[in-house]
């Protein structure tokens, strides 16, 4: 890690002997050359082997040496003192005064100096700036004054530091003045959909690069991100990915920054600390007591837990462990991968979502950022409670949805996959797969929530292979009846309960269809006798509905197993000699019912 504790002292370049109020030579003040044309701007002011200060994504300057220059992308390949290497944009590189006698403006690269836009020399780095080129504009009183003047770059270099910028001293006051304006136009920045990164890599007051998921604050008004090192309102150093703040920058407030801590819950503390541990140690799983709780206790003051601050140290572990076990869509236990059960990690390594941005998750889930994007993890339902949603994954009780989007998208996927597998012949000849008609959404809540969790990828637990035909799955109709081969019959018959329809493992033969037809004939005969009697005795439809939900697998066969949330995978498809289509299906062997 680069050391930037002495960023301000790293400006060891020799300053220009010219004073800020000293008139520049005549040759430098002329606006044109002898031929009457303006001086041509140099293509690049950097040289290979040149020592420079480069601003990193934390807002601090680090000393490095230029090894390569890319004029097309306006960037330099720099090797830093700790042997790390990176491409840095020209806008984030600061050089010392040039050794030549000519002085040009660092911004416009022009060498003229005339009122009211004279050239002013920085007393720290020796760079020259036109009064109107510098941000903010340099007042004319600075030219006539004997006090030292520092350019914007040097003010930030001497005041910014880890944990927050200086709050007292002349340089701190100068920083506050500099922060009233930005060296770029916020409206010109091209942001991503989540407003977390922009194409120009321009953030904060300093205009340098940044990583929103590390130590940065987002202004709730202009939505720009600001480095921890550049703000002056922090009382304690920030944690990585800690966005539980209401922050207003100096530009929007037209004065000092505004900062307010948002309340934390135990799940937020566990999530935030696990994220910090993963960033620091570059691994996923941590011991919940030896590592996680140690980190929480050591950084208890930096967490600013609010109402939880008075919780005794002996009781904290109980609350944290409860949160780790309750939010299974957010945390992953080691026992899921055959490790120790007291090991925990984040399912997706993203920072926790603060409550003040929960309303934006419907438009842009947290997991869609390009740094942490994982395919197939996108919430499709509106988010009503920030505690039920984490990083774009909707919590549905203890059932987790991994690897595919839930909700309507899954139903469409089932429909598209299943429709080609069906025809009228297969439906009429396979009674165990007959399905109900139209769906009653309000009456089949528990049922429909399970149907959306069908997984085509299979599972790692015990499996069994059977042959059946996959068909479209629907919910319960309002009449709580279903249509079967042209006749109406009740959906729930207690004494005719059968098993789930799992056939013994055997080779698929044409005689299977004959067995199915025999069973269908017997079944139709029984239902014909009981049809009128049962319809007259269905007084309490609510009880019948509950019974139907509990025994749905008895009548729907393979579709019933799908309705109960059992995962399956289609392994093969074949057409028999008599034209029947059969499928080889691998079942997980366990359902959610």
Curated annotation (Swiss-Prot):
Location in the cell: Nucleus
Modified residues annotated as Phosphothreonine in this record: 24
Residue spans of biased composition, Basic and acidic residues class: 360-374
Basic residues bias: start-end ranges: 12-22
Keyword field contains Electron transport: no
GO cellular component: cytoplasm; ESC/E(Z) complex; nucleoplasm; nucleus
Pfam families, per database record: Mtf2_C (PF14061), PHD (PF00628), Tudor_2 (PF18104)
Polar residues bias: start-end ranges: 23-32, 445-454
Chain positions of cross-link Glycyl lysine isopeptide (Lys-Gly) (interchain with G-Cter in SUMO2): 360, 522
Record-level GO BP terms: cellular response to leukemia inhibitory factor; epigenetic regulation of gene expression; negative regulation of gene expression, epigenetic; segment specification; stem cell differentiation; stem cell population maintenance
Region of interest (Disordered), ranges: 1-35, 360-411, 424-486
Residues that bear Phosphoserine: 452
GO terms of molecular function: chromatin binding; DNA binding; histone H3K36me3 reader activity; methylated histone binding; RNA polymerase II transcription regulatory region sequence-specific DNA binding; transcription corepressor binding; zinc ion binding
Start-end of Low complexity biased regions: 459-471
Zinc finger residue extent: PHD-type: 102-157, 201-255
Keywords from the named record: Chromatin regulator, DNA-binding, Isopeptide bond, Metal-binding, Nucleus, Phosphoprotein, Repeat, Ubl conjugation, Zinc, Zinc-finger
Quaternary structure and partners: Associates with the PRC2 complex, which consists of the core components EED, EZH1 or EZH2, SUZ12, and RBBP4, and various combinations of accessory subunits including AEBP2, JARID2, PHF19, MTF2 and EPOP. Forms a dimeric PRC2.1 (class 1, PRC-PCL) complex consisting of at least SUZ12, RBBP4, and PHF19 or MTF2; PHF19 and MTF2 stabilize the dimeric structure which enhances PRC2 interaction with chromatin.
Family: Belongs to the Polycomblike family.
Functional description taken from the UniProt entry: Polycomb group (PcG) protein that specifically binds histone H3 trimethylated at 'Lys-36' (H3K36me3) and recruits the PRC2 complex, thus enhancing PRC2 H3K27me3 methylation activity. Regulates the transcriptional networks during embryonic stem cell self-renewal and differentiation. Promotes recruitment of the PRC2 complex to the inactive X chromosome in differentiating XX ES cells and PRC2 recruitment to target genes in undifferentiated ES cells. Required to repress Hox genes by enhancing H3K27me3 methylation of the PRC2 complex.
Comment, domains: The Tudor domain recognizes and binds H3K36me3.
Protein name stated in the entry: Metal-response element-binding transcription factor 2
């Amino acid at each position: 890690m680069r050391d930037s504790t002495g960023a301000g002292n790293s400006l060891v370049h020799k300053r220009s002997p010219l004073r800020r109020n000293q008139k520049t030579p005549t040759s430098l003040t002329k606006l044109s050359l002898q031929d009457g044309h303006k001086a041509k701007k140099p293509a690049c002011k950097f040289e290979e082997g040149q020592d420079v200060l480069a601003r990193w994504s934390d807002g601090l300057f680090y000393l490095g040496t230029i090894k390569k220059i890319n004029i097309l992308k306006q960037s330099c390949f720099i090797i830093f003192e700790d042997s790390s290497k990176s491409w840095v944009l020209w806008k984030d590189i600061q050089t010392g005064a040039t050794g030549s006698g000519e002085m040009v403006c660092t911004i416009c690269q022009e060498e003229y100096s005339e009122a009211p836009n004279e050239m002013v020399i920085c007393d720290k780095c020796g760079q020259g700036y036109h009064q109107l080129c510098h941000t903010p504009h340099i007042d004319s009183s600075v030219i006539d004054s004997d006090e030292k003047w520092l350019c914007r770059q040097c003010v930030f270099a001497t005041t910014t530091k880890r944990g927050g910028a200086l709050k007292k001293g002349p340089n701190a006051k100068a920083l506050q003045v500099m922060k009233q304006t930005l060296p770029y136009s916020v409206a010109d920045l091209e942001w991503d959909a989540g407003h977390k990164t922009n194409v120009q890599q321009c953030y904060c007051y300093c205009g340098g690069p940044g990583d929103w998921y590390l130590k940065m604050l987002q202004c709730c008004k202009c939505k720009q991100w600001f480095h921890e090192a550049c703000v002056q309102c922090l009382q304690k150093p920030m944690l990585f990915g800690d966005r539980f703040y209401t922050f207003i920058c100096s530009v929007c407030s037209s004065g000092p920054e505004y900062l307010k801590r948002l309340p934390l819950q135990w799940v937020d503390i566990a999530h935030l600390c696990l994220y910090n541990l993963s960033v620091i140690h570059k691994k996923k799983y941590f011991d919940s007591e030896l590592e996680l709780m140690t980190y929480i206790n050591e950084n208890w003051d930096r967490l600013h837990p609010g109402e939880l601050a008075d919780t005794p140290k002996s009781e904290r572990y109980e609350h944290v462990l409860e949160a780790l076990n309750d939010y299974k869509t957010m945390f992953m236990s080691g026992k899921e991968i055959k490790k120790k059960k007291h090991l925990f990690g984040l399912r997706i390594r993203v920072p926790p979502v603060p409550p003040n941005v929960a309303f934006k998750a419907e438009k842009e889930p947290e997991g869609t950022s390009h740094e942490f994007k994982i395919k197939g993890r996108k919430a499709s339902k509106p988010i009503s409670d920030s505690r039920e949603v984490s990083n774009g994954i909707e919590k549905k009780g203890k059932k987790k949805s991994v690897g595919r989007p839930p909700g309507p998208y899954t139903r469409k996927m089932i429909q598209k996959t299943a429709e080609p597998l069906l025809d009228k012949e297969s439906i009429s000849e396979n009674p165990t797969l007959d399905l109900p008609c139209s769906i009653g959404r309000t009456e089949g809540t528990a049922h429909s929530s399970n149907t959306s969790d069908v997984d085509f990828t299979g599972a790692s637990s015990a499996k069994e292979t059977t042959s059946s035909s996959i068909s479209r799955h629907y919910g319960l109709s309002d009449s709580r009846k279903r249509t079967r081969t042209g006749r109406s019959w009740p959906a729930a018959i207690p004494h005719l309960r059968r098993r789930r329809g799992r056939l013994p493992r055997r080779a698929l033969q044409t005689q299977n269809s004959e067995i199915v037809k025999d069973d269908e004939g017997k079944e139709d005969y029984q239902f014909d006798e009981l049809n009128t009697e049962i319809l007259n005795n269905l007084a309490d439809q609510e009880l019948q509905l509950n019974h139907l939900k509990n025994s749905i697998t008895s009548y729907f066969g393979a579709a019933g197993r799908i309705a109960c949330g059992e995962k399956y995978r289609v392994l093969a498809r074949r057409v028999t000699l008599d034209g029947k289509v059969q499928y080889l299906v691998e079942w997980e062997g366990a359902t959610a019912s």
